[in-house]
């Protein structure tokens, strides 16, 4: 059991590292082929933040573990807001300045409501998967459009922060090297995650949904945690919040869409009745924190969000059938 736990942690870290290097390589390739840096920052990097969840969800679907993938999508969104935003605010209170973010928040809430309409009947169909993936494509087209608009205006704080984070060195050989390394690491790492998560689920008699909501969700959210804390410490507040918004949209559109397309079927009724409801509630709270005046997310809010995450875990354990068998 301890070996499985250690291998699961190593696998999650390798998935996160492989995703980071793949985004680095993709950014260099896009820059080499003349794609504007701001579009790279708002598309490639946005997808990269959710890449660990996407990869693990894809692997889970190929193994027929639909509830694990659904749990990872919903749990990652809850973790991103309650734990990651909460810890970032505890490290240093921050303010949301970007007009781009305030335009994206309603879309995050819209996608959250759409996800509820997909989950409410207790099953994911291929048509649901196609619909969600089309939503992801529309979202990408939208952020390309607002990236071009922000590039022309040139005075938005988020755009300045994203440009500062893009790699400025490295050519095609470096990009292809990291791309190759990532494509070797990530399949092995995801196999480690899925196999050892299954071992732990069997050992503790945990449901696949509960495992996805907790262990997998927290583990695959490590890149968002690192980005958020590094961002607020460097004063790049908007990129910390922007990554959470982008990750939450891609989690619902792609991390739910791929399993529906690959392994359609019934899902645990608790996914909608319990976990989706919590995710929608914390998404609304997140939006209100970003919209209110002044738009500062202080340590008080950080404490409330972090405590909310602990309460949610306690609710999973005490009030719901977290374990099966």
Which sequence ranges carry the predicted segments?
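Hydrophobic alpha-helical segments, chiefly the membrane-spanning helices
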Residues: 1-325
